[in-house]
């Protein structure tokens, strides 16, 4: 198998374009659900353009790490996105790495995000990085175990092959292992994308914010790439969920029609998932930091059960 | 392969060994003339290591999977002792590691040891540095148990002398003693293990030990395995035998710490591999299970304790425990695969472990050298007094950052590759056995994930608190960049990190002889998917990864930000301004996040393990609501130290004190002893 | 030429000469010359024994086999080193005013007598004479221990002489019983032959019960003199209170000489009763001594007592090695004797230097950081300590490993494991204690030693020999030790 | 039995047994007696018995060299040593042993037990001893009780005396077991050794007395551990 430049370009464009849309949708629907008017769906695009144009203010204490962090976050999220099958079973970069590489890349992005938070010497940034690293650390085992559950049934960590395997196996979703893995991954998704009940993307209250705290000192295009990278990461994780657990609808052949169809269904699936996220965010309150581990360990247990059930039902 | 090739490497090795000796002697002779001693000692060690490197690499490249015949270094004049060495793939691989580090560390030491000239006797430092390298190389080359043990003990002895180099501090002395005692106990176990083999084969030769286990009674075989596991485990610093490691590694001079964390603890891995794959024959299942479990526990606990440290070098030492654990996961899985007769998977897991061995050697040495440079610049190991060094020593900061990324197993660097291989082998291990045991694989995989994430957290803390933000103390404020040779030493290791990360397939060919020797499988061909730049899990459709590809793609994608900048932000300016300080006039360093604070969430989450306790002293003038000064200190309890080692030590002292009463000084009592002995023997005789 | 008799006579002569002169230098000179000559003669004897097997003189009054030759070598070497060290040592004591010229002369006289007695022990053919010689060494060494005439040294000497002569009385019983056995049930007009060379041939015909009883008494008696636990109680006192040269002699050879006497009985018993009885006793008490020594080392507060306990541990190891009674273990044990004889005096010499610099042997007083005050002494002491704790590249590592692997080869696994455990325990103790005092920064500022090279020749000589023989055991010496091991193991 | 015996061996044997028994009795007296000078005299008597035994052996068995032993014992152990010790005692004017560890009755009891033990140990060898009955048993008993005496007494002098009684026991054993005693050279060696030993002990006792102002050896407990 070899690389299709066209596919790469296409998927890159898709990620760049779709990511702000998803966050916009979620913000908007959440507002609606809470009887507010809320920002328009395309608000994130406007924000990005605005940020890109603005001057950059850099802290006097910050070093070069501060300025490269946003680009690392952006690029890692983007290249991670190229390993996920979105429209076709065959992800453009599945040859360059599967689930493990994807997790690794996202972790690399987080690494620099946290460093960027520490660099301006403000207490908030440090607090944010500390919490971010803690939560991701305890989210990691659940994530890995869930991935393992899927990968074991497919026999590979290559997401395209996993998708393909599930594609052939008709309607795998009923498999309890997958249900539990899905649930686990959903919780991890909430944690990784900084959603209620783990984090509150809307707040700027010092003591509760996590992701925002790290971005506090960023401005201008640096902030733009930070935000954009975050939303791309969110899109990537969501598309893993939707495409690995409901793979039936990925485009089988290369015809334009098939692509179009796949794209539509993909967007629908995303909207469905976003709706779920919105509901969860609305009906739940943010957890205290030290209650978060309980939630994530619940995810871990779910994934472990899923694994156990693959073991039992084979 | 060209004939006489082994001869070549043999010659190179001999030259190297002789050079080490020359280095030892010359630096002892020149100890009065500090700088000259430094030049000679580290010059010789560097050249010697270079010779060794060429020899071992040529050997591995030529791919001798079968050992070349042993030869005597120098004729022994003592019966039963033969100073004979042989080069085989495993030994050559580890020899390559020690030589590689030897080169980089010697370069680094030129600048580093200068700092001691006049203050301490650098001649001693150089001499024992050479001896240590020499002994370690011989450990990997020794061909019989007697010689192996001699080299092993000399290694321990010189390491002890290096650890207690700055013996003026009490902490250093006690650490050295603890290290030497535990290592000696370990050596005792090794002696017993080897003697069990000797009992079975009536010989000391490693040749005759090969696959000896199959001819031994199972009980003795298992006993030997356990003895070796203990003996080599002490050296490798597995939990719960690790307590000496975070004590001894930090107090040594940094180039020595790098050597110890990089290579010396790897001798334990070497021994374990040698014994369990070469000597003891087909392993029963519980060996693999034990090693895998120990590995997992060591990995998780190691990184957890590392997170609690704010002493930079102790933090790194704890990470050595973690990485030893990861290596052992690979070895344990390999043993289990051997038991279930999956040689290819065994080869995969083994190469994962060995790959991580060399990776850890490189980036841990790199990090210790960085820490050494920081120590050299700030004269403190306490991270709470550092900060802002990225501006004052940018190159060191860059090297340290790369090391940190590598040890956190982040792509595209070498740590990621070896852990990726470990994941692959664990993943495929699930299918190898129908029994419930197979759940161990994914679970330890999850623990490995936890370890990786915690390591990332820990190094965000290590790098962030040490190098970023503003300086927390005067030391840190007037820090300066390290001299050239120290930077060069770090640079070499950084380059190796990148190479090992970006060209794994090419490197794995060097491992072929080893896997061929130990598992009978050649791997590198199975590990390349299509192009030579893509690494693949061995299974028919295992995952693939290409660090090089990822890097290139990322570079291509970075055109997007550039383009966007050109489109929107060409005219935007960059302003430097103060960080928002909540309305305070200026941002005080005290307002920064501290290392202790950074790791507090983890400390709270795992409080069952850490049993943290804190002391807060606050002073105020007129009302407790307006505190003038506040002093906070948090401690965690090291369970093994407080629950196992300290009580045992107390018990020993108590017994000994009690026994002194026997020698109370009264001659009557002494006469009674003799009298009773006489009566006893009279009864015994009649 | 009368080799053996001259070996015994020369020290006596030097003793006589020493009693005449006053000058310290001359005294030291005499003894050095004498013992250098002894060493030469010892090598001569070594060659003769290798060729002839057995050398005897004065119609077999003197009698030397491989075992005796080996012992002669050890005694000569240690005595030479001691006399090299003693001269300078006492000159410093004299300068410090702790000792009078008369006492110094007394030391040199008694020291020569001490050595002469030991030579006689190993060369005497008649067991009675052997006993007599051993008693002579005991008396000489008692006066040496009491040389400083301090309260503590008198106390030590008193305990030493009481326990020692009691033990020797028991040994005398053993001798009598053996003689009775030699006489046999049928008394005859002519005196029976009480020579070793005769006894060993008729051993199998001797009365078994008498020999057994004799061995029990010999074991307790000579065991007391050799410092086997629990009869060892005099040992740390005497070693710590004697002047350092004497401590070196006591621990370096005197203990081993007593052990030699015990071995003679052991051989007789094995010939008569088989190996089991005496072997078991040696092994059991050897192990007991080792395990007793370790805790005392760990909590010791006095430097020379520490070293004394380490000697106890080594003697125990040697006994155990011989008690295991396989060719390999006995060979290892005899080799260990040699290496230990070369190692331990160095430690005592170093302790002497430390004592004279710090005017105390209490570890607390010597405190941390001796290395800053006496760099060279500490360096040599460190080497010797590494050797004594059985670290390579020194020979004791080799001999210890030989004994233990011999045990394994003979399937005496448990015993060997116990031996190893005891060795490790002792190692831990010595390492902890010596690190505590030698390394570190001194508490109080001591004047850096004026004469750093004091005692270095003696220590250098021994350490050099040790290192040499650690990497190079000449074939002839190996042959000698093997023969000695054969004699001990009962292979005629 | 091809031993050429002229005078009636029974008589000799009887006499020897008698003397040996007397030695034992004297030993018991030593155990209970606390006056030092008396102790010394008792020891002298014991030694006298020993030399008597030697003489008897020499007379009844034509072992001319045993006369020498007898003579030496007489000179040395009956006259010289007691004289020496007397001088020592007068010099450091101490008249009697302080309270021993065990009081008189208990020590008698202990010695009785030790005698029993001596007999048990010696029983297998009754066939071996040529002269007298149970002389070997008595010799071993002398050893054990002497040992006990050393443990029980605290004055340096009386410990020396106890040691000397042990030596007597050895001599007795030598005579009893081995017809003609040991070879002369050995006897001489042993004898002079004992002499020297006692002198050394004397010197030490004197020095101890000087520097400790006492002879109580149970006070010598500086060296511990």
Residue ranges, per PLM feature:
Chain D
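Alpha-helical transmembrane segments of multi-pass membrane proteins predominantly involved
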Residues: 2-225
């Amino acid at each position: 198998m070899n690389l299709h430049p066209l596919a790469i370009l296409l998927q890159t464009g898709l990620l760049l374009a779709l990511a702000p849309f998803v966050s916009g949708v979620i913000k908007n629907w959440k507002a609606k659900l809470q009887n507010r008017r809320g920002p328009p769906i395309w608000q994130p695009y406007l924000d990005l353009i605005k940020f890109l144009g603005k001057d950059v203010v850099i802290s006097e204490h910050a070093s070069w790490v501060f300025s490269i962090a946003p680009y690392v976050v952006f690029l890692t999220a983007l290249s991670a996105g190229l390993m996920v099958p979105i429209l076709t079973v065959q992800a453009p970069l599945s040859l360059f790495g599967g689930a493990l590489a994807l997790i690794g890349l996202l972790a690399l992005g987080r690494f620099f995000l946290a460093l960027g938070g520490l660099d301006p010497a403000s207490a908030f940034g440090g607090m944010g990085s500390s919490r971010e690293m803690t939560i991701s650390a305890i989210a990691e085992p659940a994530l890995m175990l869930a991935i393992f559950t899927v990968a074991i049934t497919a026999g590979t960590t290559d997401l395209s092959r996993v998708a393909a395997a599930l594609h052939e196996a008709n309607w795998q979703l009923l498999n309890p292992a997958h249900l539990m893995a899905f649930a686990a991954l959903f919780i991890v998704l909430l944690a990784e994308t900084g959603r209620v009940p783990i984090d509150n993307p809307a707040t700027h209250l010092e003591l509760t914010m996590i992701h925002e705290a790290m971005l506090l000192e960023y401005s201008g295009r640096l902030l733009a790439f930070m935000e954009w990278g975050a939303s791309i990461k969110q899109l990537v994780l969501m598309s893993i969920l939707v495409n690995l657990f409901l793979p039936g609808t990925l485009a089988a052949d290369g015809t334009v029609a098939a692509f179009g169809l796949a794209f539509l269904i993909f967007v629908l699936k995303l909207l469905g998932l976003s709706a779920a996220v919105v509901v969860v965010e609305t009906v739940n309150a943010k957890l205290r930091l030290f209650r978060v581990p309980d939630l994530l360990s619940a995810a871990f247990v779910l994934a472990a059960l899923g694994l156990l059930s693959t073991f039992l039902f084979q | 392969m060209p004939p006489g090739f082994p001869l070549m490497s043999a010659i190179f090795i001999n030259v190297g060994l002789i050079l080490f000796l020359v280095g030892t002697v010359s630096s002892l002779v020149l100890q009065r003339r500090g700088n000259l001693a430094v030049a000679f000692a580290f010059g010789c060690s560097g050249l010697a290591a270079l010779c060794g490197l060429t020899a071992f690499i040529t050997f591995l490249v030529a791919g001798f999977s079968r050992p070349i015949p042993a030869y005597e270094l120098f004729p022994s004049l003592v019966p039963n002792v033969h100073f004979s060495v042989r080069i085989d793939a495993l030994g050559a691989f580890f020899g390559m590691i020690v030589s590689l580090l030897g080169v980089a560390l010697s370069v680094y030491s030129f600048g580093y040891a200068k700092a001691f000239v006049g203050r301490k006797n650098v001649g001693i430092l150089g001499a024992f540095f050479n001896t240590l390298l020499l002994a370690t190389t011989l450990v990997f080359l020794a061909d019989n148990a007697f010689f192996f043990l001699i080299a092993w003990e000399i290694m321990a002895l010189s390491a002890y002398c290096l650890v207690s180099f700055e013996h003026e501090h009490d902490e250093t002395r006690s650490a050295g003693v603890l290290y030497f005692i535990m290592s000696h106990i370990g050596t005792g176990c090794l002696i017993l293990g080897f003697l069990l083999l000797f009992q079975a084969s009536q010989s000391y030769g490693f040749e005759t030990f090969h696959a000896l286990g199959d001819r031994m009674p199972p009980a003795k075989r298992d006993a030997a395995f356990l003895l070796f596991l203990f003996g080599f485990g002490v050296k490798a610093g597995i939990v719960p035998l690790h307590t000496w490691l975070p004590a001894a590694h930090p107090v040594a001079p940094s180039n020595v710490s790098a050597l110890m964390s990089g290579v010396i603890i790897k001798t334990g891995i070497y021994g374990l591999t040698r014994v369990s794959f070469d000597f003891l024959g087909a392993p029963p299942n519980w060996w693999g299970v034990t090693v895998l479990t120990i590995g997992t526990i060591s990995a998780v606990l190691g990184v957890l304790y590392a997170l609690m440290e704010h002493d930079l070098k102790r933090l790194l030492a704890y990470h050595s425990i973690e990485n030893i654990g990861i290596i052992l996961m690979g070895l344990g899985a390999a043993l289990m695969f051997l038991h279930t007769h999956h040689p290819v998977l065994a080869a995969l897991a083994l190469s994962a472990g060995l790959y991580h061995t060399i990776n850890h050697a490189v980036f841990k040495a790199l990090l210790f050298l960085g820490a050494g440079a920081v120590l050299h610049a700030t004269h403190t190991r306490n991270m709470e007094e550092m900060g802002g060094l990225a501006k004052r020593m940018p190159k060191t900061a860059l090297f340290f950052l790369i090391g940190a990324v590598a040890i956190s197993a982040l792509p595209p660097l070498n740590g990621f590759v070896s852990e990726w291989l470990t994941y692959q082998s664990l993943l495929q291990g699930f299918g190898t056995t129908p029994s419930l045991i197979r759940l161990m694989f994914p679970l330890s995989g999850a623990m490995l994930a936890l370890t990786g994430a915690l390591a990332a957290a820990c190094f965000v803390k290590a790098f962030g608190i040490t190098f970023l933000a503003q300086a927390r103390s005067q030391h840190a404020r007037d820090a300066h960049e390290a001299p050239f040779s120290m930077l060069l030493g770090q640079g070499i290791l950084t380059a190796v990190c990148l190479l090992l990360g970006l060209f794994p397939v090419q490197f794995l060919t060097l491992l072929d002889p080893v896997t061929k020797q130990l598992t009978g499988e050649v791997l590198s061909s199975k590990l390349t998917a299509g192009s030579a730049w893509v690494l693949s899990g061995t299974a028919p459709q295992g995952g693939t990864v290409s660090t090089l590809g990822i890097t290139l793609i990322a570079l291509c994608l970075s055109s997007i930000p550039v383009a966007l900048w050109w489109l929107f932000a060409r005219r935007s300016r960059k302003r430097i301004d103060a960080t928002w300080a909540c309305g305070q006039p200026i941002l005080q360093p005290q307002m920064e996040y501290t290392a202790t604070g950074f790791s507090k969430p983890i400390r709270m989450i795992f409080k069952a393990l850490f049993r943290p306790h804190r002391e807060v002293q606050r002073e105020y003038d007129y009302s407790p609501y307006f505190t003038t000064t506040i002093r906070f200190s948090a401690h965690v309890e090291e369970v093994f130290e407080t629950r196992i080692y300290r009580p045992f030590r107390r018990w020993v002292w108590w017994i000994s004190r009690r026994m002194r009463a026997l020698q109370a000084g009264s001659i009557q009592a002494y006469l009674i002893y003799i009298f009773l002995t006489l009566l006893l023997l009279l009864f015994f005789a009649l | 030429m009368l080799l053996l008799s001259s070996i015994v006579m020369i020290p006596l002569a030097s003793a006589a000469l020493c009693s005449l002169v006053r000058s310290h230098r001359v005294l030291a000179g005499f003894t050095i010359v004498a013992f250098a000559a002894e060493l030469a003669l010892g090598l001569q004897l070594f060659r003769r024994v290798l060729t002839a097997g057995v050398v005897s003189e004065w119609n077999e009054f003197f009698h030397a086999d491989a075992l005796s030759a080996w012992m002669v070598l050890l005694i000569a070497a240690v005595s030479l080193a001691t006399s090299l060290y003693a001269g300078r040592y006492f000159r410093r004591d004299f300068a410090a005013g702790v000792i009078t010229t008369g006492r110094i002369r007394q030391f040199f006289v008694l020291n020569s007598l001490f050595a002469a007695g030991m030579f006689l022990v190993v060369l005497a053919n008649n067991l009675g004479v052997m006993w007599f010689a051993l008693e002579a060494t005991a008396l000489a060494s008692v006066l040496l221990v009491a040389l400083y005439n301090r309260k503590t040294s008198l106390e030590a000497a008193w305990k030493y002489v009481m326990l020692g002569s009691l033990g020797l009385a028991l040994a005398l019983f053993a001798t009598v019983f053996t003689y009775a056995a030699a006489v046999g049930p049928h008394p005859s007009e002519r005196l029976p032959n009480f020579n070793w060379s005769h006894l060993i041939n008729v051993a199998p015909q001797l009365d078994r019960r008498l020999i057994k009883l004799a061995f029990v008494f010999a074991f307790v008696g000579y065991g007391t003199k050799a410092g086997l636990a629990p009869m060892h109680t005099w040992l740390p006192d005497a070693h710590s209170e004697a002047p350092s040269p004497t401590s070196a002699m006591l621990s370096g050879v005197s203990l081993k000489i007593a052990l030699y006497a015990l071995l003679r009985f052991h051989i007789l018993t094995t010939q008569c009763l088989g190996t089991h009885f005496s072997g078991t006793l040696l092994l059991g008490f050897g192990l007991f001594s080792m395990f007793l020594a370790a805790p005392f080392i760990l909590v010791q507060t006095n430097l020379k007592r520490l070293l004394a306990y380490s000697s106890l541990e080594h003697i125990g190891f040697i006994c155990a090695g011989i008690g295991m009674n396989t060719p390999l273990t006995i060979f290892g044990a005899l080799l260990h004797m040699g290496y230990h004889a070369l190692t331990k005096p160095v430690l005592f010499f170093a302790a002497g230097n430390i004592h004279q610099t710090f005017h105390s042997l209490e570890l607390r007083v010597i405190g941390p950081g001796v290395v800053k005050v006496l760099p060279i002494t500490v360096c040599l002491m460190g080497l010797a300590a590494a050797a004594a704790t059985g670290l390579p590249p020194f020979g004791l590592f080799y001999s210890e490993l030989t004994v233990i692997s011999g045990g394994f080869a003979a399937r005496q696994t448990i015993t060997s494991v116990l031996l190893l455990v005891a060795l490790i325990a002792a190692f831990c103790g010595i390492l902890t204690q010596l690190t505590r005092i030698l390394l570190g920064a001194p508490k109080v500022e001591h004047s850096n030693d004026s004469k750093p090279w004091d005692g270095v020749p003696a220590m250098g000589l021994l350490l050099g020999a040790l290192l040499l023989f650690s990497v190079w055991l000449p074939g002839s010496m190996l042959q000698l030790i093997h023969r000695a091991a054969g004699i001990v193991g009962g292979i005629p | 039995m091809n031993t050429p015996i002229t005078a009636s061996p029974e008589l000799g044997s009887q006499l020897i047994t008698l003397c040996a028994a007397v030695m034992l009795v004297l030993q018991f007296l030593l155990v209970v007696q606390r006056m030092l000078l008396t102790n010394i005299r008792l020891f002298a008597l014991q030694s006298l018995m020993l030399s008597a035994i030697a003489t008897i052996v020499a007379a009844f068995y034509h072992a001319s060299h045993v006369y020498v032993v007898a003579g030496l014992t007489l000179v040395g152990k009956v006259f010289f040593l007691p004289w020496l010790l007397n001088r020592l005692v007068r010099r450091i004017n101490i008249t009697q042993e302080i309270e021993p560890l065990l009081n008189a009755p208990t020590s008698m009891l202990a010695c009785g037990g030790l005698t029993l033990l001596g007999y048990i140990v010696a029983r297998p060898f009754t066939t071996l001893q040529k002269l007298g009955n149970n002389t070997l048993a008595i010799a071993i008993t002398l050893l054990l009780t002497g040992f006990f005496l050393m443990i029980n007494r605290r004055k340096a002098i009386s410990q020396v005396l106890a040691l000397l009684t042990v030596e007597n026991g050895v001599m007795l054993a030598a005579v009893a077991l081995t017809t003609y005693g040991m070879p002369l050279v050995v006897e001489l060696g042993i004898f002079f050794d004992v002499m020297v030993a006692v002198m050394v002990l004397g010197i030490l006792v004197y020095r101890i007395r000087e520097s400790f102002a006492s002879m109580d050896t149970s006070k010598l407990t500086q060296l511990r551990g």
